[in-house]
Amino acid sequence: MTTKKQEKIKFSKAFWVANTVELFERAAYYGVFIVITLYLSRILGFNDIQAASIAGIFSACLYLLPTFAGALADKIGFRNSMLLAFTLLTCGYLGLAVYPTWLQSAGLVEYSTTTTFTGLLESNLQYGIIPIMALIVCGGAFIKSVISGTVAKETTPETRAKGFSIFYAMVNIGAFSGKTIVKPLREALGNEGLITLNYFSASMTFLALLAIWFFYKSAQHSGEGKTFGQIWNALIKVCSNGRLITLIIIITGFWMVQHQLYATMPKYVLRLAGEGASPSWYANVNPLVVVLTVNLVTQMMRKRTALTP
């Protein structure tokens, strides 16, 4: 009995490496995403509607593309996919830091605790941030499919629930950590901290890249999977399932509300409570509760299925 129990909680090296880099990636992503609309408005001069629209499209693409990125990842292998993903993410986050610096050196804007626009708003150069954000979307699309795929393939039916609870805990530890550094940077540097934050995110994804390069090896998922045509046909089949589409619409409603933590809440809190307020800490309630309760909930639901009332 004891031996059997020990086998159930034993995971492969690839499992732990994948979960560790997931923590790094989530810290990078949420550190930036909690202030993305502030960044777009205060650093690049977009108004509220423009900033929210760009952030919304960014998020929508990030959640749509994993379906297709996952198919490509199956073809080229998970290790190669993660190397590509973290390279794109590192370049993307670095671009979010470097691009405003270039705009400032061109005399179009001045950054300090506040921002003074000296020509940027009259140019179209603020839209140069779009292809940089596209790098993050493409890199993130691979990560969303590959890390969860690694967890699935590196676990057994007996250890899968525990494996995914560890994965989900890592996601939320990363989210909590990334958002925690936002307030100190804003207090110390003001608007300039919104730029500096991206160097932190780039360093996190670069560390993840190194971890994959040196430590990630697995024979579980090299070159296999479906073609894009098969994926597309499967999507059409899914869309014809009325019950599933109804469930997706219900879940979409939840995510529409949840994502207001990032789309509108930071600006709302700062305008209502002042610049000393901490929208990042308000948003941290979610990952903190998840980290503290995920193991308990996993144990409670162990003998139930997704359809068990």
Segments (PLM) and residue ranges:
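Juxtamembrane intracellular "pre-TM" segments in multi-pass secondary transporters
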Residues: 2-12, 221-249
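Extracytoplasmic gate region of multi-pass secondary transporters
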Residues: 30-38, 178, 242-283
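Central cavity-lining transmembrane alpha-helices of secondary-active solute carriers
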Residues: 56-71, 284-297
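Glycine-rich segments within core transmembrane alpha-helices of 12-TM secondary carriers
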Residues: 62, 161-186, 202-208, 286-287
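C-terminal ends and interior cores of transmembrane alpha-helices
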Residues: 87-124
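Symmetry-related core transmembrane helices of the 12-TM Major Facilitator Superfamily/SLC fold
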Residues: 130, 195-214
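Intracellular juxtamembrane helix-capping segments at the cytosolic ends
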Residues: 142-156, 269
